């Protein structure tokens, strides 16, 4: 599927993290998808925000998928007000 996507001359939407990009480190393996847009789910993924991954992530959005705030609090994660403007937030153009 990755090879077909790379050969297609069409825009690609990555869901959460583009295939081939490490969500934690941002390391890019071969082959890797070059998405025109990436829609991350629930929380930003550190690796997607790394400089080395930028050529593969395109425009970045974050989507609220309904995970309760209490779950984030139990994990020690705080993202106050990130979805105050709506369920999908643009992070980078």
Show the residue positions of the predicted features.
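YjeF_N-associated NAD(P)HX repair module
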Residues: 1-93
